[in-house]
């Protein structure tokens, strides 16, 4: 895992067991301890991380709030948390559509659409804490 340090210009990596254990579970019953946790800050960081994973045969799971009840945000590979700095939104076609980054909370997306009398499609019970990115 030392090679990952050179992937992005300023990666935020967590390889200590205690840090990885914090991401070993989501709201589901599943638990997998990832090999590393990173928080890419921009698209360039994500691109470098994807290139690293491809060339090293490891997987990346992108994660935001971790509210999944089915284990979609746990992995033995690399967890890439995309919350901080990933909260932009754009209303399109006069409210007929919305473009969201992964760190936007579902309930917040609905607030953005409220003036247009619209809502996003999914309506989970966790809408006020679930994020678009999973």
Residue ranges and their predicted role:
Residues 44-45, 67-69:
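Short active-site-proximal "capping" loops at secondary-structure junctions
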Residues 71-76, 110-112, 132-133:
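Short acidic, glycine/serine/threonine-rich loops at helix termini
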Residues 64-67, 125:
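Short, ordered loop/turn segments at secondary-structure junctions
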Residues 127-131:
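Glycine-rich anion/phosphate-binding loop at the beta-strand->alpha-helix junction
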Residues 66, 103, 134:
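Active-site glycine-centered loops adjacent to acidic/histidine catalytic or metal-binding residues
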Residues 1-28, 32-33, 52-60, 65:
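N-terminal accessory segments
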Residues 27-60, 78, 82-124:
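N-terminal glycine-rich flavin-associated loop
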């Amino acid at each position: 895992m030392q090679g990952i340090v050179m992937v992005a210009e300023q990666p935020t990596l967590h390889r200590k067991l205690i840090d990885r254990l914090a991401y070993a579970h989501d709201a589901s019953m599943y638990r997998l301890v990832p090999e590393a946790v990173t928080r890419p800050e921009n698209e360039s960081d994500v691109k470098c991380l994807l290139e690293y994973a491809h060339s090293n045969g490891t997987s990346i799971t992108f994660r935001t709030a971790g509210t999944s009840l089915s284990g979609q945000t746990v992995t033995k590979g690399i967890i890439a948390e995309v919350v901080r700095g990933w909260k932009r939104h754009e209303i399109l076609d006069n409210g007929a559509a919305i473009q969201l980054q992964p760190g936007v909370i579902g309930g917040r997306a609905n607030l953005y659409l409220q003036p247009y009398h619209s809502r996003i499609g999914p309506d989970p019970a966790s809408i006020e804490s679930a994020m678009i990115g999973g």
